[in-house]
Amino acid sequence: MEKLAAFILVLTLLCAYWQSAEGIREYSYADCTDVKGDSAHRYSGSRCFCYSPGTVIKWKDIWSTFKVNVSSNVDVVVVFPMETINCHHPDDLLTVMNCFVEHYWPSTVQRETSLEIPLVDVDICFMIKSPRSNTEYTLHVSNKRLNRMCFLLFVCGLILFFGARNICRSSLFFYTTGVSLGIIATFVFLTLLLRNFVPKRGLFLVLLGAGSGLSYMGIQRVLNEWDDIVTEHWMELLAYVLISGLFSFAVCYKHGPITNKHTLNFMTCSMQAVGIVLLYYGITFPPAYFVLVAVLLCWKILPLAWSLLMGICSLFYSFLALFRRRRRPTVRLLTEEEYREQGEIHTRASLDELREYCNRPGFPAWETVLRLRSPQRFAEFLRQGSHITQEEHQNHENHYGLGGAYYENVIFNNSSSSDTQSHREEAEDNSEDEIVGNSPPVLNNLPSPTIYPPTICPYPPVTYTPQPEPLDPEDQDFF
């Protein structure tokens, strides 16, 4: 979806550049008359004029235009741009593509008695056409000034581009767009409404394209005959707006706002493309527009490019990891002395934590004392005393210390097992024919099991007195 957004924005930028390249050509004709700002002169016949800004274009001039007004008793119009691009001898590939677009979708040439013409850093030429060569007219050219409509379009374009995500997820935008689409483009609205009944996606796209074409033709027809419709058929127009608006609102209210993630992303991309178009019509100086759009595209595409670069790097490192030999970490076993030292350290730390926990104000001391066998020993432990007695320590050292009973059993068991193994090897070397049938089996010296002291229950013994269970009413005697 991010790639689709970038493609839509780039396509919008190219279309805007094609349109701007047509009307911002540098015309330098020897027979054109130079005019200055805030000047009014009388002329006759069709002729071309060139206006020079006279000053360097500044940042505040990107929303500025100059106004050309012609007044006459007959139909005299201002034509801008005065001619189309030379498609017979194109200069570059962009001109060829622009000519191709111009051939199938010709742009409209402005023919009005008053025009707002944008500023460029070269002379701007326009033409005054009159029906006869002796027709006189008055031409008035004003200086550059801030075009409020262009500035408003620029602000709206920025708002749509940066706020497209929040706007598309707004319920107000959903209902407003649905009602407007139902009124203006009824065929498109009905096609989207009946989408679930169309079996194939290709057929749906064909129907959507046909509905869009019919809606466009209807809008063009209404705009061409707007005056007659408003004056003669205003009641029918009002009834159509009310009925289609209420029906569209009811359908939108039934289905609710859009929650599909892909649809919302597509709407966001379309909204950003509309914002780019508004920026194009809001900025009158084309270089400033292209710089701004380049910055916006970089801001939009950089996160996608960064994620793509990180994905490529991760794949490359994963590919290199297949050829690198994994080294297993060397593990060193602890010695007996290190094992004893770590045991003492961790035991001391655990005892300190236990002592700290028992000295807290919220510790249930009385309940704990009632459950202990020797509360005095527990109190001495809390006063930084030892957790074992001297006798217990001596018994532990005698059993597990150096020269203790535990290591003696281990040593003797190992020696007994080695003697048994040697006896087995000698018995295998004897002949198979010399078998002693009555010889008793040799018993293996098994290691004596480790004797552990009996466990001591920390809770005091409590005598259990069984309580008689009450009899049910059904079990009682009736006599």
UniProtKB/Swiss-Prot annotation:
Keywords for the protein's UniProt record, in alphabetical order: Glycoprotein, Membrane, Nucleus, Signal, Transmembrane, Transmembrane helix
Glycosylation site positions: N69, N414
Phenotype of gene-disrupted mutants: No discernible effect on morphology, viability or fecundity. Simultaneous knockout of nemp1 and nemp2 results in viable healthy animals but both females and males have impaired fertility with females laying normal-sized clutches only for the first 3 weeks followed by a marked drop in fertility.
One Pfam family matching this protein: NEMP
Ranges of compositional bias, category Pro residues: 450-470
InterPro entries noted in UniProt: NEMP_fam
Transmembrane regions: 172-192, 203-223, 233-253, 276-296, 301-321
Segments of this protein annotated with the region Disordered: 414-479
Keyword Transmembrane helix in record: yes
Location relative to the cell: Nucleus inner membrane
GO biological process, one term: oocyte maturation
Membrane topology: Multi-pass membrane protein
Any one annotated GO CC term: nuclear envelope
Annotated signal peptide: 1-23
Low complexity: bias regions: 438-449
Primary location: nucleus
Family recorded in the similarity comment: Belongs to the NEMP family.
Role of this protein: Contributes to nuclear envelope stiffness in germ cells. Involved in male and female fertility.
Name the UniProt record assigns to this protein: Nuclear envelope integral membrane protein 2
Organism: Danio rerio (Zebrafish)
